[in-house]
Amino acid sequence: MIDVQQLRALVELSRLGTVSAAAESLGFSQSTVSHQLAALSRATGAVLLTRAGRGVRLTAEGRALAARGQEVLDLLDRTEREAVSMARAEAGRVRLAAFPSAVASLVPGVLDVVGQQYPGLEVELVDAEPPEALDALRRGRVDAALSFSYIDDDAGEGLESVHLLDDVLYLVTHPGGITRIADGAQCRWVTGCARCHEELIAVGRANGFTPETAYASDDYVAVQALVAAGVGAALLPGMALSAYRHEGVQVRPLAREQRRVEVVARAERPRPLAIDVLVEACRTAGRRTSLRRPAVRTGGSAASR
């Protein structure tokens, strides 16, 4: 069997050109490196070196073994780093940014998966809507972020996203309110975060009206309370309605309107195993999440477009 240290001596000789340089790089004497090379030649049964003046040079067999040896050493180095990373993942901390409805519906599943597989890994939760969450991710303040978008775009330079699920949008009204999104000009609207507001504007324009905003709140519980009080209508995603449903509102699904929910991490390689563990836990939680379709109080959908 080939000894790793002997293989490393051959690789260093190939890289540096002389036994003395290889010995200095490895921290051994020239005599020790020469013995290692001779032992490697005996172990393989191949002539690896030939005399060249006062020094030596690699034979064709020596060059071939050195090239393959570099691959083996690289693999060993990666394996060692992964083992260290795994040990840290089993007893460390990762930071996850998440928007409110994800905290209520998706994050509990993420924490459950991590807790079962890596009980020593602590997940620190940071509340943040997508723009702020992605900015925190780029700045290294969090390790991953749960995000959403209403168009199929990438997360941005230096980031990579993994699709988790598609979240249907619902028209939320008080009893006696509008029943079709096309009638949106007849009422005022309660809107949410910046991205949610942009989507409301886009949906409204696609259905022939520009929404008149009455109030804005990132809190989906508050939004439903305002709708129930007759302040206006709202668009809310299924994740929010599955986490909390006010008894005083009616909901109708919007055909063809949904948002893409994803987990985003920095596109770095190699990446700490703890972050990979967190991303995979998000994928597992996404697969397990069964978004309860909110009951439609009056029947039918609020067809859009």
Where are these predicted regions, by residue range?
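Secondary-structure junction motif
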Residues: Q186-G208, A229, R271-V279, G286-A295
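Beta-alpha-beta core module
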Residues: D154-H163, D167, V221-P270
